[in-house]
Design a protein with these regions (language model features):
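Compositionally biased terminal segments of proteins
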Residues: 1-134
Length: 134
């Protein structure tokens, strides 16, 4: 599931980001599925996904154009929700015939508030302006 800056973009606030933050439920099957999805999307085959330790903020893979994929197994502010609950609420779109899940708006705001970094505060302000107009 895509979280962070890319999810912010999907909800209307276009900002540059140097990474794609994804949240997965850590299991052997999900690691295999992630590897298959990246390969299918033409991003590359990252064999080390099968065995690497996922440490939030530290586990990333360099993709094309120096873009990083940051893999997280927990999200600050969302500890009281299971991965399945968040997945059920996710916004889904297709990119190159591949379903891509984005953290739902409400939980994205919750996670941004919990992170409380300057860029997260700006994201919240801009998203709230955009969504008040709708």
């Amino acid at each position: 599931m895509t979280i962070g800056g890319f999810a912010v973009n999907i909800y209307g606030y276009g900002r540059n980001t140097g990474d794609i933050d994804i949240f997965i439920e850590d299991s052997i099957e999900n690691r295999k599925n992630l590897r298959i999805a990246l390969k299918k999307a033409g991003i590359g085959d990252f064999e080390n996904i099968n065995t690497m330790q996922f440490i939030p903020g530290w586990t990333d893979i360099t993709l094309n154009f120096n873009l990083r994929l940051d893999i997280m197994t927990s999200v600050k502010g969302l500890e009281n929700s299971t991965f399945e609950e968040l997945l059920e609420k996710a916004y889904i779109t297709e990119i190159n015939d591949i379903p891509v899940y984005f953290l739902d708006y409400e939980n994205l705001i919750k996670a941004k508030k919990a992170s409380n970094r300057p860029k997260d505060i700006l994201d919240i302000e801009e998203l709230e302006k955009i969504n008040k107009k709708i």
